[in-house]
């Protein structure tokens, strides 16, 4: 019996081993193809580009097809968030491009073209008085999004004041001239006090950073600008490009797929001269390049996790110098009725669409 069992067992065992070897060889031959398919699935994303120069459009706001929910923003390569690709249609907003409604199901390739919308800033020559400060008149629109739902929107006209040798590029002071506020109370329902506080109205100039190539053209590589508070988990860098006469802010967030960059062109408020010309010789400044910052504050809680997105867009309307007497007079100005500047906000963009479902706050 033992002999018979041995004779029967050996052929079966050898047959199994032979089959396992064949299977192993097949797997090895298919492994590169399998890995290639997996990589393509993981990294294949739809890209948003400029219709003229085909360069990636960075930090474009992505909404669902109805424009009611914020999905996210495009990264430094212009790629859509992966969650957006799962939708049938999306709505895209960018301060320097025409709004676009895209049906992803009928998209022929993986590229979305946006049509540029430029706002020219004329060349201005100004003379500085003693102890004067640079005064910039701006139009600001600010939106907070609480867990993907627009919660508060404000529009403001303001003066920003910069001292000589301003190293950080932020305004030293500001004066709100007029403003309009809208709020959706339903967006706050069921949220924590912390999130409600973050989503409520705040200083619209808080994200204003202005720094051009003049102050940073002596730097090589990147300069760390600062680290935001722990919950935000963000680090800012300023990269300098002396060849193209520009620099860019890099924000590296713990909650982003990869760092995104905000390019800045032409303007510097450090080393102000007695007479200085803000020139367009390097090309017409695109206003969104001066300020179009988005920031995310994410709050962790015991049972739930929520977040608030803050989006600020700022348009430059005028630049001059203001003496001490003029600044004192500015501070005494009372709020005037808000009037939106003509030719800036396109009809049907995210602002006009969002405030339709909100209540005006006095």
What are these regions (language model features)?
Residues 1-47:
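Bacterial Sec-dependent N-terminal signal peptides
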